[in-house]
């Protein structure tokens, strides 16, 4: 990225923000980690964004504040967001849903706090199999990874009054050797419906 070439997932996020057509939006990234997407949006987005990062990992947020002095960060849980209803222009779920057993609640909370848009970034998808939970070691600890059935995920979006306006290709991520069917990742741009 610092050489000027974006990875597919970074390009997907920049495109998702562009598709909202908002000027100077308040963007809250849930699951921001070390907040590298702040840099991505700052360098490559066609609009200025007011960025706030939220993560439950205190150490990750310390890294974010060291790397990006002055960044606004909060410790919080995706299933219990510390924001008022409709207070955020664009809620970005940053490669997070795949690690949450409470993903349905996280989607509901994303919808609750978002005024206009929810972006669910780099979501792994299946077409045939039901939503599947895998367990692996990552980030130095046992971690779960959820691969979503595309139709099931769309039904959850619809139930939460989120209209999918775009599904952008993200990182290549084919788990066919493990799951017996090809997988992809998408970044979903969802409009909040009244």
PLM feature segments, named:
Residues 1-21, 24-33, 40, 119-147:
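Conserved class I S-adenosyl-L-methionine
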Residues 34-80:
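Class I SAM-dependent methyltransferase SAM/SAH-binding core
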Residues 92:
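A conserved beta-strand element that flanks and buttresses the S-adenosyl-L-methionine
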Residues 95-99:
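Short catalytic micro-motifs in class I SAM-dependent methyltransferases
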Residues 104-117:
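A short glycine-rich, Lys/Arg-flanked "PGG" loop and its adjoining helix->strand segment in the class I
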Residues 144-167:
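Short alpha-helix
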């Amino acid at each position: 990225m610092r050489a000027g070439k974006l990875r597919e997932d970074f390009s997907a996020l920049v495109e998702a923000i562009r598709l909202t057509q908002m000027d100077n939006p308040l963007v809250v990234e849930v699951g921001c980690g070390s907040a590298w997407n702040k840099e991505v949006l700052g360098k490559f987005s066609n609009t200025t964004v007011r960025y706030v990062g939220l993560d439950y990992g205190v150490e990750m947020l310390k890294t974010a504040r060291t790397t990006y002095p002055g960044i606004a960060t909060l410790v919080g849980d995706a299933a219990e967001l510390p924001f008022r209803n409709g207070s955020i222009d664009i809620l970005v779920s940053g490669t997070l849903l795949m690690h949450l057993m409470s993903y349905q609640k996280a989607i509901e909370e994303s919808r609750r706090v978002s005024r206009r848009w929810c972006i669910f970034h780099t979501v792994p998808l299946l077409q045939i199999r039901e939503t599947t939970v895998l367990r692996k070691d990552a980030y130095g600890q046992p971690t779960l990874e959820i691969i979503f059935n595309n139709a099931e995920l769309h039904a959850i979006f619809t139930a939460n009054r989120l209209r999918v306006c775009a599904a952008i290709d993200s990182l290549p991520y084919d788990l066919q050797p493990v799951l017996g069917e090809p997988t992809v990742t998408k970044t979903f741009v969802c409009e909040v419906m009244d």
